[in-house]
């Protein structure tokens, strides 16, 4: 509240939109941005990857910044003639009251699954859920995924009207006739809309999972007057850096960079890509050092079960030995019949993946996503997977 007053209550000069959920926050946030910009709005973003104010892109470390920073960003956005801000609202942000005192115009809930539970985050799933549910006590209009198993718990104490979206016929906005579409450097999904919006949508983000992200964004955009024609223009070629990001290679396989860095996210993307029925699905990933060992076992087992071939490599080893992390991943991998190879150096691992990809394959580089560094022994070294891919294609690896 003090921060809001200090900056002259800038939130009152903007249409404020908050997106919360375990998965899909970033994708949905940028979908909302694209949809509203197609209709002529100037949209600021406060997200996991960055803060966007006009042409300025500011890298960030926390999903939800401190209260002072949020209102500082709001003020800069208002001064840059933004009329809308979309922000990712994390459970930690609600727990630590970083968004206290902001009455969002629109609040959007994507989904909920166990994550961020531990000594430095939430003590248990019940606390995690209750923090997410705070959004619907802090907005004027709420939008929620009716297909999520925790929908009823998330919305039961809402103090705002809730509009629903999903594949469920009882939703206010329903997607139907969902169809996956594929070309060499394109994976997408088409679907019809009925309810609060009517028409056909072609979305350039892979998987039925992203139908829910699109529906959430469309719900808000429709409320703000965006037409179905404008929605299609925005979504057909939509992409978010490091989130199921297709990287063109010029070859007859599909290469994807994705931020999936835990078992839930890896399982989700591998199932999503398997639905496109590739001859082979190749998964490349590592796990962060000085983090939960359980995550390593789980990710190894998930990839072993769901990918045709796994390349186990380094992520951010931090202060651990990369080989020790790989050995932990192998404990999970060896519970399965999955084929694998381990290559410690991530550059070499990516080179191996591209040189061994065959026509029709889908190759996913998981874990790093938008990150452009590798953290080793307390130092962050520059490492961009897009640049590595280009180097491989240019024959440097």
Regions found by a protein language model. Give the residues of each.
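Phosphate-binding loop of NTP-binding sites
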Residues: 1-146, 150-158
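Acidic, Mg2+-coordinating active-site environments of NTP-dependent enzymes
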Residues: 14, 78-80, 95, 105-255, ...
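Short glycine/serine/threonine-rich phosphate/pyrophosphate-binding segments
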Residues: 25-31, 89, 93-94, 211-214, ...
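Generic beta-sheet signal
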Residues: 46, 110, 145, 165-167, ...
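Short, small-residue-rich loop/turn micro-motifs
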Residues: 47-50, 111, 193-195, 367-369
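Short gly/pro/ser/thr-enriched loop/turn and capping motifs at secondary-structure boundaries
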Residues: 50-53, 114-118, 170-175, 318-319, ...
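Short SAM/SAH-binding signature in class I
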Residues: 84, 105-106, 216, 358-364
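ATP-dependent carboxylate-amine ligase
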Residues: 159, 196, 219-233, 239-240, ...
């Amino acid at each position: 509240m003090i921060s809001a007053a200090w900056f002259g209550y800038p939130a009152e000069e903007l249409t404020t939109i908050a997106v919360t959920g375990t998965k899909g926050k970033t994708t949905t946030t940028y979908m909302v941005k694209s949809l509203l910009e197609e209709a002529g709005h100037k949209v600021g973003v406060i997200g996991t990857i960055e803060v966007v104010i006009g042409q300025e892109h500011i890298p960030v470390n926390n999903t939800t910044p401190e209260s002072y920073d949020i209102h500082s960003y709001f003020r800069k956005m208002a001064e840059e003639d933004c009329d809308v801000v979309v922000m990712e609202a994390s459970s930690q942000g609600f727990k630590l009251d970083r968004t206290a005192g902001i009455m969002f115009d629109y609040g959007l809930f994507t989904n909920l699954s166990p994550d961020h539970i531990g000594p430095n985050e939430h003590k248990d799933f019940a606390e995690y859920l209750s923090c997410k549910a705070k959004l619907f006590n802090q907005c004027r209009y709420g939008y929620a995924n009716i297909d999520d198993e925790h929908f009823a718990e998330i919305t039961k104490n809402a103090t705002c009207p809730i509009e629903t979206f999903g594949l469920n016929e009882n939703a206010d906005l329903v997607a139907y006739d969902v169809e996956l579409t594929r070309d060499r450097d394109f994976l997408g999904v088409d679907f019809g809309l009925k309810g609060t919006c009517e028409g056909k949508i072609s979305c350039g983000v892979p998987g039925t999972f992203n139908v829910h992200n699109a529906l959430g964004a469309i719900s808000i955009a429709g409320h703000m007057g965006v037409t179905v024609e404008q929605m299609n223009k925005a979504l057909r070629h939509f992409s978010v850096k490091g989130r199921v990001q297709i990287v063109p290679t010029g070859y007859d396989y599909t290469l994807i960079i994705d931020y999936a860095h835990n078992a839930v996210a890896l399982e989700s993307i591998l199932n999503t890509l398997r639905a496109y029925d590739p001859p082979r699905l190749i998964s490349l990933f590592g796990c962060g050092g000085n983090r939960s060992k359980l995550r390593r076992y789980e990710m190894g087992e998930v990839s072993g079960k769901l990918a045709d071939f796994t390349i186990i490599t380094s992520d951010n080893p931090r202060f651990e030995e990369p080989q020790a992390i790989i050995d932990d991943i192998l404990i999970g991998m060896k519970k399965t019949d999955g084929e694998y190879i381990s290559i410690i150096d991530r550059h070499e691992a990516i080179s191996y993946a591209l040189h061994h990809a065959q026509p029709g394959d889908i190759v996913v580089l998981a874990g790093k996503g938008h990150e452009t560094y590798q953290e080793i022994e307390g130092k962050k070294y520059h490492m961009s997977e897009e640049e590595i891919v280009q180097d491989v294609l240019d024959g440097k690896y």
